[in-house]
Amino acid sequence: MTGAATRFAFMVILMIAAGATAAGVPEPDGYRLQDYRAPTPATLQGARVIRTDEAEMIWHSHSATFIDVLPRPPRPRDLPAGTLWRDKPRANIPGSIWLPDTGYGELAPSIDDYFSKGLYKATEGDHARTVVFYCLADCWMSWNAAKRALALGYSEVVWYPEGTDGWLAAGLPLQDATPEPRPDE
């Protein structure tokens, strides 16, 4: 084999191995509780799983509400007076609602209530409205949030595991995001 053919064969083997590894991640019985930035399952029982091309079609059709669940570090409570604090910027899919910190495996009661009320507001109380959950690629937070929406009785739950990483890689637009206000802020 030539050098180019050997490199090509090696790349194919790596891609197959990577796909097999990602496909082999089982769904846990409950929520993922740690190591949130890790390969995710290919499925979420009760939800539809989509790739970027389908997410783009849904976005263009305005047929769903997109929910970003990327966490956001809170402003430290013990900052001295006069200390300048800047939130880390977040760019998400245009038109999305950002409900930060709602993808952890265990939620404080106030954050659980924030998620429930935020989702209710985003869907105008329509539990049959299509809701697309996302975060970043290889991020369990969107998986957990989508699973939580199913537990709340939402019937048209869509999980977009590629998140803003896949969206940006496809050359699609992102916009600066502002999170929905949290009760503890």
Predicted regions: what they are:
Residues M1-F10:
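Bacterial N-terminal signal peptides that target proteins for export
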Residues M15, A20-D53, I58-S61, R77-P80, ...:
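Rhodanese-like catalytic fold shared by cysteine-dependent sulfurtransferases
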Residues A55, T65-L70:
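Short hydrophobic beta-strand that contains or immediately precedes a catalytic carboxylate
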Residues V69-P73, D78:
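Surface-exposed acidic loop/strand-edge motifs in secreted or periplasmic proteins
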